[in-house]
């Protein structure tokens, strides 16, 4: 499944041993750009990039000229033998149903400015789509990329047919939103919440379909098997904070009115040492306005993040800007962060 494509003077192929230093340099350019756009900072330790270059060389030797290794795809663009761009893809299915498309997550796309006018970025994504299509073996597959809001590449993705399907905001967790006492309370989900969570999950799935987000399962019929599986999951003791924790907002009667999943995990080098917090999969009772039920949910998540020494929290799986869900997060102290753009492979 070797990728060899010539577009003008651009050659797209798998990385070769000895190119680790060039690829690590590209990654450093990318992390520096993300930091300028407000993203997570990269390390300034040169030894980290030297180790990264060695790991990339070893990875290239294992690949033996093939872009695909397991579920990971790695492609570089070269001009006259010099690497001028690279992209990674992570191939998986976000769901249990056979009809749910595979997703190839676009990661770390970076191209030297001098190679952009030659179409290196487009060539990399075109080949990544082809790899994804081959891995899917005839099943549908979707390419998905997260693009930070300050990133000037929005127009580039749009020209290639990518369309936004979900949005994110981000907040400083020390700015925990104030919550009105007595109306709604947030807490970790418990097994007895399983039926309510199954209903909310179905609403989330329907919302994703309405946004043309093909990455996830369609709404499922709510039956005893589904509710039992959710209850069993909620009753299981979590081993660490990197596993999703379900949080819920309940009203004065104890009825669940909103839910979300919290994940806190360390960022690996070459990022600077820190923790990343994501609160996503927001599902809200449509009979309720988002703001009052979100406030205690986000406040509780902020407290978990502070305890884990994570400075910020991303709020993902949001509807488009200008809608009540998205705007509620801004009212609670978040700012625009990123969007997910997708296209069929």
List the predicted regions and their residue ranges:
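A short beta-loop-alpha structural element at the N-terminal edge
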Residues: 11-25, 31-38, 185-212
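Conserved beta-strand in the GNAT
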Residues: 72-76, 82-91, 105, 110, ...
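Conserved acetyl-CoA binding element of GNAT-fold acetyltransferases
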Residues: 90, 99-113, 271-288
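Conserved glycine-rich acetyl-CoA-binding loop
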Residues: 108, 112-123, 149-154, 159, ...
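Conserved acyl-CoA
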Residues: 112-114, 123-142, 293-311
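Conserved beta-strand-loop-alpha-helix junction that forms the acyl-donor binding cleft
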Residues: 113-116, 127-128, 132, 142-153, ...
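Conserved active-site alpha-helix within GNAT-family acetyltransferase domains
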Residues: 122, 134, 148-166, 319-337
């Amino acid at each position: 499944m070797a990728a060899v494509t010539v577009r003008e003077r651009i050659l797209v192929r798998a990385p070769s041993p000895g190119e680790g230093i060039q690829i690590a340099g590209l990654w450093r350019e990318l992390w520096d750009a993300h930091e300028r756009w407000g993203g997570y900072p990269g390390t300034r330790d040169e030894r980290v990039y030297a180790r990264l270059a060695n790991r990339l060389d070893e990875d290239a030797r294992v690949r033996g000229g093939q872009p695909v290794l397991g579920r990971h795809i790695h492609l570089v663009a070269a001009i006259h033998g010099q690497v001028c761009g690279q992209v990674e893809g992570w191939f998986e299915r976000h769901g249990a149903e056979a009809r749910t498309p595979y997703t190839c997550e676009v990661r770390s796309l970076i191209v030297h400015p001098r190679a952009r006018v030659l179409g290196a970025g487009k060539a990399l994504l075109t080949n990544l789509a082809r790899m994804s299509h081959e891995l899917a073996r005839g099943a549908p597959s979707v390419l998905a990329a997260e693009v930070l809001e300050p990133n000037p590449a929005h127009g580039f993705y749009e020209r290639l047919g990518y369309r936004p399907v979900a949005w994110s905001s981000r907040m400083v967790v020390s700015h925990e939103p104030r919550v009105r006492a007595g109306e709604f309370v947030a807490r970790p989900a418990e097994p007895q919440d399983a039926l309510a969570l199954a209903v909310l999950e179905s609403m989330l799935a329907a919302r994703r379909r309405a946004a043309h987000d093909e990455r996830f399962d369609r709404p499922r019929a709510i039956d005893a098997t589904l509710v039992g599986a959710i209850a069993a999951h909620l009753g299981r003791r979590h081993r660490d904070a990197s596993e999703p924790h379900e949080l819920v907002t309940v009203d004065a009667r104890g009825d669940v009115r909103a839910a979300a999943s919290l994940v806190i995990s360390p960022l690996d080098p070459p990022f600077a040492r820190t923790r990343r917090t994501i609160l996503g999969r927001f599902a809200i009772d449509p009979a309720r306005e988002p703001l009052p039920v979100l406030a205690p949910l986000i406040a509780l998540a902020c407290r978990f993040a502070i305890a884990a020494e994570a400075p910020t929290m991303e709020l993902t799986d949001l509807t488009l800007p200008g809608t009540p869900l998205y705007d509620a997060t801004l009212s609670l102290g978040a700012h625009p962060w990123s969007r997910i753009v997708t296209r069929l492979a």
